[in-house]
Every structure is written in structure tokens, then in C-alpha cells.
Amino acid sequence: MTVADAKKTADQKMQKSIETLKADLAKVRTGRAHTGILDHVMVEYYGNPTNLTQVANVTLIDARTIGVQPFEKKMVAVVEKAIRDADLGLNPATQGEMIRVPTPPLTEERRKEMVKLVKSEAEDAKIAIRNIRRDANETLKKLLKDKACSEDDERRAQDEIQKLTDKFVLEVDKLVVEKEKEVLTV
């Protein structure tokens, strides 16, 4: 491994941490409906647990209602039960072949819980990013010890990795501010 490899690996892993945070934040319910809250609902499909998006079309009907239309008519009841059992606080209602999923407005208390959850997810992402920095710095020290790079190269690479860390931590903070604003908007 070279100094450039260590930097590239750290960058890729930090980027992955940001992607994971974005995915986690998408699961957090806000006052508005969005199809992302149903992304992880699993449906029993011919005996196999299958992602809801594989067996139904999920769309927004309006700001507070999600529409779920199973591809097969016989799946309507199964999909409705899966959404109800997903522990998302949602109460789907079937209208013919379409399942309407109204998202109730969040109470003030629930909004504050969601903000805490968002901050917790962000802190986990920051910890992951810092751990990646630590691993990269240890790799650089090992390269220096093995005489694969000079002290100047190691110092320069550490500075660049620190800049990467700062950049990604700033991005985490930005994502959190956006999500908090979204959660607290009534």
C-alpha cells in the first residue's frame, strides 16, 4: 500500500459513511409523507420475505398520503398487513387495488424524539469518520516504519486526511441541520 492508496481508501470509506447516514436519515419520519419510510418494509411473497418496492408501486398521492399499488391483486391484503406490522406508526387503508397510507402529523414530543434520533445517527457517522481517519493514520505510520515513505510524505498525507475528515464531518453537520429543519417544520 502506498500513501496515495491510504488517502484514497480513507476518502472512499468516509464517502460510504455519508451514504449510510443519508440512508439512515431517510428512514426518519417527518411530518410530510415520503416514499422512503416504506423502503425497508418486507412483504411475504410466495414464501420469501421480499422488499415492498419489489412487489408494489409506491408513490406520493399528496403531502400527507403515500399510495401503494401491488403489482398483483392478491397481494393487496398481504402488503397492507406488512405495512401495518412494520412498526412505523402508520395505518394503511385499502381502496380497491390501491392502498392509501396516510402519515399522521407528528406531535411536538415525537418531533423532539426524532431530532434526538437524527443527532444520534449523525454522531455515529462522525465516530465512523474519525475511526477511518485513525486507521488511515495508523497505515501511514506503518508505511513510515517500513520505510515505504518519508516523514514529510507521512506528515503531508496526515494533513490531507485531516482535511478530508473535516470536510466529511462538515457534510454530516449540514445533513443534520437540513433533517432537523425538515422534522421540526409543522
UniProtKB/Swiss-Prot annotation:
According to the UniProt entry, the coiled-coil residues are: none
UniProt lists the family membership as follows: Belongs to the RRF family.
Gene Ontology terms: cellular component: cytosol
This chain's function reads: Responsible for the release of ribosomes from messenger RNA at the termination of protein biosynthesis. May increase the efficiency of translation by recycling ribosomes from one round of translation to another.
Record key words, sorted: Cytoplasm, Protein biosynthesis
What GO MF terms are annotated? ribosomal large subunit binding
Task: Please give one Pfam family short name.
Answer: RRF
Query: What is the organism of origin for this protein?
Result: Herminiimonas arsenicoxydans
Q: Where in the cell is it found?
A: Cytoplasm
Any one GO BP annotation for this protein: cytoplasmic translational termination
Q: What is this protein called?
A: Ribosome-recycling factor
In terms of superkingdom, the source organism counts as Bacteria
